[in-house]
Amino acid sequence: MAMAGVFVLFSFVLCGFLPDAAFGAEVDCSRFPNATDKEGKDVLVCNKDLRPICGTDGVTYTNDCLLCAYSIEFGTNISKEHDGECKETVPMNCSSYANTTSEDGKVMVLCNRAFNPVCGTDGVTYDNECLLCAHKVEQGASVDKRHDGGCRKELAAVSVDCSEYPKPDCTAEDRPLCGSDNKTYGNKCNFCNAVVESNGTLTLSHFGKC
């Protein structure tokens, strides 16, 4: 289960309540302290208080402040689904689907085109469970089924602005991001440097560790 939570300073571009997303609850982001960073930008200051909440993106955040910080930093409309950690994923048995082995030794899952959408923990809607299994097996992705039916829009992968990168040196700030390559990047700087190296093929899967 993805979890985002550390002591961080995030770019603070707005105050007040986060938008009330589907099934979500408003979080008053204006109650959290802010400061000014070296670049003169207002930043939101969060601590490590362990009061986990589940965001509408399916990620468990350490506390309300961290949810606000990620949402504001990346311009999302993620709000609070409920207090406590996000619920466990729905079990699925990928071994029940037929498969074959390619000439180069890779296992390929054989799927039909039946349309029975499921939502993956990566925020992607798959046409059916078999196709989710195919992605998991063939790409080695750490993705599971969150629920039957398509993902809500809050779960869609967030576009990260990497226009100011690459940068030769990144800070040690620990605000993890999970990339579409199933690798965890320590912060936005590390992630964006990797995006540049990939010629833009790398995207954000979700906040927190993979």
Swiss-Prot record:
GO terms for molecular function: carbohydrate binding; IgE binding; IgG binding; serine-type endopeptidase inhibitor activity. The record marks 172-173 as: Reactive bond 3. No decrease in activity observed after heating for 1 hour at up to 80 degrees Celsius. Retains 20% activity after incubation at 95 degrees Celsius for 1 hour. Residues 1-24 form the signal peptide. GO terms for cellular component: endoplasmic reticulum; extracellular space; protein-containing complex. Residues 25-88, 89-153, 156-210 form the Kazal-like domain. No decrease in activity observed after incubating at pH 2.5 and pH 7.4 for 1 hour. Retains 20% activity after incubation at pH 12 for 1 hour. The record marks 48-49 as: Reactive bond 1 for endoproteinase Lys-C. The record marks 113-114 as: Reactive bond 2 for trypsin. CDD domains: KAZAL_FS, KAZAL_PSTI. Glycans are attached at residues 34, 77, 93, 99, 199. One of its GO terms (biological process) is response to steroid hormone. Avian ovomucoid consists of three homologous, tandem Kazal family inhibitory domains. This is Ovomucoid. The lineage of its organism: Eukaryota, Metazoa, Chordata, Craniata, Vertebrata.
